[in-house]
């Protein structure tokens, strides 16, 4: 089972189908429009576990969470929802002993009405699971996570995900608060990208005070805000006006030029960030150029998606970008994700692993 943004089930299904085929696991995705999830039905027993282990979760773009389904309950009795789940799981020999329990719903308005029930249900369910030996007596982040996902009252999928190959967040969504002094809500996209793409223990080194960043298409400054907040200096490139609150920090230089034409005058930039409303292929190529020329070491940027053929567009743009970097002998690590705060767009992170001689 995979969670995704409502309206992106088709893209999520295309992706799981591709990844399963690569692992020689065969089946088909069950897709219900705007449901916020996809269930991939495997033809062979044990294949769901193979996918939960074998698919690199961080390589999935459209999935917010992934777990192997062990059982589906379509009509749990309202007076006792615990016993049928315990009875079923106790019969499954291969079900792993779990270290954490998450009782969740897909991210739709209808399903989220069940969240209050999910919260109330968690403590008695956890106690019952521990009593049956299905969970360890103490929370253990190194053990599998037990997921119960309610898609409707009395209708749930029960399964497990593996630590290090799942989303650490409840429902696959980081809980971020909008900072009152940020100039636009887009600031949360970049903050979420830092949480998703950069391990927390590396923040001090890779998002360090005193670094220089460049923000293309910066105004009014939602993304710049995240860099300034981390005591960085920023070249803001946009013909529009920047928020006064950012200008007053003394940490930014505003360049009123086209983002596609700006060139940094010194090679001291660590971060290039970009959230321009432009054709995705054009933005991807621009970011490739920045990294190739040694103008930045890391990039986070958004690719706006077309109305149709979104998955194909993403695959094509990423393939072209990877090919461009490989042909130019740039060593890199690339991640892409349809973040919670993204809408008709995805966010890409590229870290340069090789020092490139200036061209």
From Swiss-Prot:
GO BP of this protein: methylation; rRNA processing
GO molecular function: S-adenosylmethionine-dependent methyltransferase activity
Record key words, sorted: Cytoplasm, Methyltransferase, rRNA processing, S-adenosyl-L-methionine, Transferase
Top enzyme class: transferase
EC number(s) reported in the record: 2.1.1.186
Keyword Transferase: yes
GO terms for cellular component: cytoplasm
Keyword Glycosyltransferase attached: no
Chain residues that bind S-adenosyl-L-methionine: 186, 219-222, 238, 258, 275
Superkingdom as given in the UniProt entry: Bacteria
Pfam families linked to this entry: FtsJ, RlmM_FDX, RLMM_N
Active site (record annotation): 304 (proton acceptor)
Cell location: Cytoplasm
Major localization listed first in the record, in broad terms: cytoplasm
InterPro entries reported in the protein's UniProt record: RlmM_FDX (IPR040739), RlmM_THUMP-like (IPR048646), RNA_MeTrfase_FtsJ_dom (IPR002877), rRNA_MeTrfase_M (IPR011224), SAM-dependent_MTases_sf (IPR029063)
Catalytic reaction list: cytidine(2498) in 23S rRNA + S-adenosyl-L-methionine = 2'-O-methylcytidine(2498) in 23S rRNA + S-adenosyl-L-homocysteine + H(+)
Function comment: Catalyzes the 2'-O-methylation at nucleotide C2498 in 23S rRNA.
Protein family according to the UniProt entry: Belongs to the class I-like SAM-binding methyltransferase superfamily. RNA methyltransferase RlmE family. RlmM subfamily.
Subunit composition and interactions: Monomer.
This protein's name: Ribosomal RNA large subunit methyltransferase M
Organism: Vibrio campbellii (strain ATCC BAA-1116)
């Amino acid at each position: 089972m995979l969670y995704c943004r409502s309206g992106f089930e088709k893209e999520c299904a295309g992706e799981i189908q591709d990844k399963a085929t690569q692992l020689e696991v065969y089946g088909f995705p069950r897709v219900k429009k705007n449901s916020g999830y996809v269930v991939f039905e495997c033809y062979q027993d044990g294949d769901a576990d193979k996918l939960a282990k074998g698919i690199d979760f961080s390589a999935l773009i459209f999935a917010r969470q992934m777990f192997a389904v062990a059982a589906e309950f379509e009509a749990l009795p309202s007076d006792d929802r615990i016993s049928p789940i315990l009875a079923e799981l106790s019969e499954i020999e291969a079900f792993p002993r779990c270290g954490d329990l998450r009782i969740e719903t897909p991210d739709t308005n209808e399903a989220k009405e069940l969240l209050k029930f999910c919260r109330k249900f968690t403590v008695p369910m956890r106690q019952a699971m521990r009593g049956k030996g299905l969970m360890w007596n103490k929370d253990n982040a190194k053990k599998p996570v037990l997921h119960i996902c309610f898609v409707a009252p009395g209708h749930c999928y029960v399964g497990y995900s593996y630590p290090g190959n799942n989303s650490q967040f409840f429902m696959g969504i980081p809980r971020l608060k909008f900072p009152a002094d940020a100039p636009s809500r887009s600031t949360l996209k970049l903050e979420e990208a830092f949480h998703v793409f950069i391990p927390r223990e590396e923040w001090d080194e890779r998002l360090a005070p005193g670094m220089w960043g460049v923000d293309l298409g910066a105004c009014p400054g939602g993304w710049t805000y995240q860099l300034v907040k981390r005591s960085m200096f920023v070249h803001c490139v946009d013909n529009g006006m920047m928020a006064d609150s950012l200008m007053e920090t003394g940490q930014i230089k505003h360049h009123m030029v086209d983002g596609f034409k700006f060139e940094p005058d010194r090679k001291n930039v660590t971060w290039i960030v970009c959230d321009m409303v432009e054709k995705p292929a054009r933005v991807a190529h621009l970011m490739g150029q920045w990294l190739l020329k040694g103008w930045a070491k890391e990039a986070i940027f958004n690719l706006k998606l077309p109305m149709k053929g979104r998955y194909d567009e993403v695959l094509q743009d990423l393939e072209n970008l990877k090919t461009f970097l490989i042909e130019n002998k740039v060593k890199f690590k690339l991640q892409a994700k349809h973040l919670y705060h993204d809408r008709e767009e995805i966010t890409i992170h590229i870290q340069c692993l090789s020092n490139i001689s200036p061209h």
